[in-house]
Every structure is written in structure tokens, then in C-alpha cells.
């Protein structure tokens, strides 16, 4: 079955989101939102599918959210064209390979605009040397067919990486090419086109910045590195080791010399800034030397916790990207006591769903 997207209703669903966002934000008196559209199809750069076995056949499936019925997928127009191409070739390549298809229950795909793809095969069985040899042959066959592919095998407490567990993305952002290492099983922005819109919007509205930037939850440095051009220095925190390593690589790959990444949670950083705790990880970093006039936050769906919210309020400017406008509005009840919204944007990161991504820039009231 080929799932068709309701592209004819794209404008209507986007209009409804804009209306919903305006209503939610009305109590905070924001300016009119800037609206950034998604491509109509093939916009999602990563996808996960369950694998269904039926006698000698196997295929990708998804489950209908309402009926819970399984849907057989040959193509998936939500995902990038590269993922769609790989879906067909991969299943055809492993269908007759017993070692590769036996107890395979899920396939994860991560693709880039730079035409690279990482495929993770997940199993309910132990993986050994026999699997590795078959997987190496599969990878070479896929590369022979023109795919720039990395292949990973996963099972309980097992991860087999044939070459690398990452691929490098190259995004055109505000007139320059930005290199971003993307690590398997780590967070990356799913909609590359909308991610570019978010980065360029953030660059544009912080062009007049003074002093330094602090970013909490920086991931692989997606925003930190793009925004570095607008600030004297950038200090960024991240808790996940693979993301920190990717961010350090990205700093070097992009020739950026004013970004410092530290591995700690937002809560730990708050304690360090308040002098409540000392951390060995901060040796050689003088937090007091940073003059952070702007703080950037892109928190999880739960929003900012109370302690971090209090810390964030101390900064003259707050750039807040939210994947959940409800928790954003809850946080704004506190933040708008001391700040006003100077910019608002809606990013249609997840078209044809109720999910909205939005951004606000808040500036301290005089």
C-alpha cells in the first residue's frame, strides 16, 4: 500500500494551526506570527518502521492510530526520497537472506540532504560474526547500487557498527554551508527544510546582539553554531555524551572558534551559575567571564522546570523554541511578568498533524 498525503488540505491545516497559535498566545500580546511552511511531501529525514513477517515475505508496516490495524508500506511519502528509495532496495536485498531477516523486527532510517543514509536493523536475537559478515556483504551491495550508506545492527545490549554510527549533514543556512554530524539514536531535527527556516529566523532576529549567548539543551550544536556569528562567544550545555562529541566535531568542521560546549544538565548548570555546587567538568572554564545577554532554550515537550525558569528570567533576552505551545504558554505566564514578546514564529515541522513548533524572542521590560 502506498500512503497518499492529503496535500490538497495543506493550506487549510496550516491556517488552522496559525489560528490556534494566535488564540493560545493572545493573553501575552505578541506580534503577528511569522509562518514557515513545510514541503508538501518527503520532508521527514528520519523514520522508524516495524517489520512484519509473513511466510517467506517481510515488509515495512505502521499501525493506524485510530483502528490499531497494521498498514503495509511499500513507500512512505512523509519520509525523504532517499529513505523511500532505500526502503524498496533494502527489503528486496534481505528478503532471501535468512541470517539478516530472521527475527528482524524494526528498521530505523536516518537520511540527510547531502544524500547520506544510516540504516539500523533491530533484532530479537543475538548478533554474532555470521551476522556481521552478511551485513558487510549487504552494505557493499547497497554501496554498489549508489547508496552512501552506513549500516548498524542492534539487539538486546548489543550494537554492531560496521563503519560509523553517524552521517554528516550539510545544510545551506543564511548563505553558508553548515556541517552537522548526526549520530544514530541521538536527537536530530526531523524536517530539514523547516530546520533551515528555524536557523535563519533565529539568526535574523538576533543580528543586533550584544555580549555572549548561553544555550541550554544544545544537542549536536544545531542552533549554537549557526548563531555564533551574531555573538562574541557562545556557551552551550548538553547532557548526552554522543551529542556533545558530535557538537565538538561540528565546531571544528565549521571552523568556529567562539563556541564552548559543556556536558551538564540545565539543572546542574543552574547550580554552577548560582555557586551552589562545583563541577570538575568546569575546570578551566570561567563562567563569570561570560557576559550572556541572551539565553537560548529549546526544551523537551515538558517545557522549562521551575528552577531553570527562574534562572532564564535573569537574562535580558530569551530565545525560546518550543515543540509544545501548551507548555510554552505555561512558561510565558511567568516570563511575561518581566519580559515582552518581540518576535513570534510558527514552524510547520510536522504537517498534517496537530503538532506545532514555534519560537519566541522575549526582551526584558524597561
Swiss-Prot record:
Question: What are the record keywords, sorted?
Answer: Methyltransferase, S-adenosyl-L-methionine, Transferase, tRNA processing
Example GO BP: tRNA methylation
One Pfam match, by short name? tRNA_U5-meth_tr
GO MF term list: rRNA binding; tRNA (uracil(54)-C5)-methyltransferase activity, S-adenosyl methionine-dependent; tRNA binding
Q: Where does S-adenosyl-L-methionine bind?
A: 189, 217, 222, 238, 298
Q: Name the catalysed reactions.
A: uridine(54) in tRNA + S-adenosyl-L-methionine = 5-methyluridine(54) in tRNA + S-adenosyl-L-homocysteine + H(+); uridine(341) in tmRNA + S-adenosyl-L-methionine = 5-methyluridine(341) in tmRNA + S-adenosyl-L-homocysteine + H(+)
Q: Which residues form the active site?
A: 323, 357
Stated EC number for the protein is 2.1.1.-, 2.1.1.35
InterPro entries referenced in this protein's UniProt entry, alphabetically: MeTrfase_TrmA_AS (IPR030390), MeTrfase_TrmA_CS (IPR030391), SAM-dependent_MTases_sf (IPR029063), TrmA_MeTrfase (IPR011869), U5_MeTrfase_fam (IPR010280)
Any one annotated GO CC term: cytosol
Family under the similarity heading: Belongs to the class I-like SAM-binding methyltransferase superfamily. RNA M5U methyltransferase family. TrmA subfamily.
What does the UniProt record say this protein does?
Dual-specificity methyltransferase that catalyzes the formation of 5-methyluridine at position 54 (m5U54) in all tRNAs, and that of position 341 (m5U341) in tmRNA (transfer-mRNA).
Which protein is depicted?
A: tRNA/tmRNA (uracil-C(5))-methyltransferase
Species of the source? Photorhabdus laumondii subsp. laumondii (strain DSM 15139 / CIP 105565 / TT01) (Photorhabdus luminescens subsp. laumondii)
**What gene is behind this protein?**
trmA
Amino acid at each position: 500500500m502506498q500512503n497518499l498525503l492529503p496535500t490538497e488540505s495543506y493550506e487549510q491545516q496550516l491556517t488552522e494551526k496559525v489560528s490556534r497559535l494566535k488564540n493560545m498566545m493572545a493573553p501575552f500580546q505578541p506580534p503577528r506570527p511569522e509562518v514557515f511552511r513545510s514541503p508538501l511531501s518527503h520532508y521527514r529525514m528520519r523514520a522508524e518502521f516495524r517489520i512484519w513477517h509473513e511466510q517467506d515475505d517481510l515488509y515495512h508496516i505502521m499501525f493506524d492510530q485510530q483502528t490499531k490495524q497494521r498498514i503495509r508500506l511499500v513507500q512512505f511519502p512523509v519520509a525523504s526520497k532517499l529513505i523511500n528509495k532505500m526502503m524498496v532496495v533494502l527489503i528486496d536485498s534481505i528478503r532471501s537472506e535468512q541470517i539478516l531477516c530472521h527475527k528482524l523486527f524494526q528498521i530505523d532510517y536516518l537520511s540527510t540532504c547531502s544524500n547520506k543514509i544510516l540504516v539500523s536493523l533491530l533484532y530479537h536475537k543475538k548478533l554474532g560474526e555470521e551476522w556481521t559478515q552478511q551485513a558487510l556483504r549487504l552494505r557493499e551491495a547497497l554501496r554498489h547500487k549508489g547508496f552512501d550508506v552506513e549500516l548498524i545492527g542492534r539487539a538486546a545490549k548489543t550494537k554492531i557498527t560496521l563503519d560509523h554510527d553517524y552521517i554528516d549533514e550539510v545544510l545551506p543556512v543564511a548563505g553558508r554551508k553548515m556541517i552537522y554530524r548526526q549520530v544514530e539514536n541521538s536527537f536530530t531535527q526531523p524536517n530539514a527544510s523547516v530546520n533551515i527556516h528555524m536557523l535563519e529566523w533565529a539568526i535574523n532576529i538576533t543580528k543586533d546582539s550584544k555580549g555572549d549567548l548561553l544555550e541550554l539543551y544544545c544537542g549536536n550544536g544545531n542552533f549554537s553554531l549557526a548563531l555564533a556569528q551574531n555573538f562574541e562567544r557562545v556557551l552551550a550545555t548538553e547532557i548526552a555524551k554522543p551529542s556533545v562529541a558530535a557538537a565538538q566535531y561540528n565546531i571544528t568542521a565549521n571552523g568556529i572558534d567562539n563556541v564552548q560546549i559543556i556536558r551538564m544538565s540545565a539543572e546542574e548548570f543552574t547550580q554552577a551559575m548560582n555557586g551552589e555546587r562545583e563541577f570538575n567538568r568546569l575546570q578551566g572554564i570561567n563562567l563569570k567571564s561570560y557576559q550572556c545577554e541572551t539565553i537560548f532554550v529549546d526544551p523537551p515537550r515538558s517545557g522549562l522546570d521551575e528552577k531553570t525558569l527562574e534562572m532564564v528570567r535573569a537574562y535580558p533576552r530569551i530565545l525560546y523554541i518550543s515543540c509544545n505551545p501548551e507548555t510554552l504558554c505555561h512558561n510565558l505566564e511567568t516570563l511575561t511578568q518581566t519580559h515582552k514578546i518581540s518576535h513570534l514564529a510558527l514552524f510547520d515541522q510536522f504537517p498534517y498533524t496537530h503538532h506545532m513548533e514555534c519560537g519566541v524572542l522575549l526582551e526584558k521590560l524597561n
